[in-house]
Amino acid sequence: MRHAKAGRKLNRTASHRKAMFANMAASLITHEQIVTTLPKAKEIRPIVEKLVTLGKRGDLHARRQAISQIRDAAVVSKLFDTIATRYATRNGGYLRIMKAGFRQGDNAAMAVIEFVDRDTYAKGAADKARVAAEEQAVAA
C-alpha cells in the first residue's frame, strides 16, 4: 500500500525526476511563466517556492544550496538579484497555478504556473517584439 507517501512518481526514475524538476525550475525562474501538465506544476511549486526563500536569505550558503539544485549560475543570480528582492515582503505564496484546458494529443490536463507579481516583459524575443509593436501603436 502507498499510504503516507508524498510526491508523484510521474512515470520516471528518481534521477530523471530530479533532473526534470531542476530544468523546470530554471525555466520557470528564467521566463517567470511556463506551461506544463497539472501534476508537474503541482510538484514544481514547492521546489521553486523553497528556492525563492533561499534567495530571500541571500547569504553565501543559500546561494550554494540553490546552485546545487539548479546548476545554472545565471539563473541563480536572477533568482537572488531580481526575484528575491521582488518578494522581500511576501511570506510564501510566490507562485500561482492556473488550469489551461487539456492537451490535444493525449488529453492531459495542462496548467500555467507563474510568479504572482511576475515581470510580463520576461518572455521570449518574439513576444517582446509583439509587445513593442503594441506600445508603438498605442503611442502613435
Curated annotation (Swiss-Prot):
Q: Keywords on this record?
A: Ribonucleoprotein, Ribosomal protein
Among PROSITE patterns, the record links this protein to: RIBOSOMAL_L17
Q: Which SUPFAM superfamilies match?
A: Prokaryotic ribosomal protein L17
Q: Which GO terms describe its cellular component?
A: cytosolic large ribosomal subunit
Note the InterPro entries from the entry. Ribosomal_bL17 (IPR000456), Ribosomal_bL17_CS (IPR047859), Ribosomal_bL17_sf (IPR036373)
Family assignment from sequence similarity? Belongs to the bacterial ribosomal protein bL17 family.
NCBIfam families (UniProt xref): L17 (TIGR00059)
Q: What is this protein called?
A: Large ribosomal subunit protein bL17
Q: Which organism does this sequence originate in?
A: Rhizobium etli (strain CIAT 652)
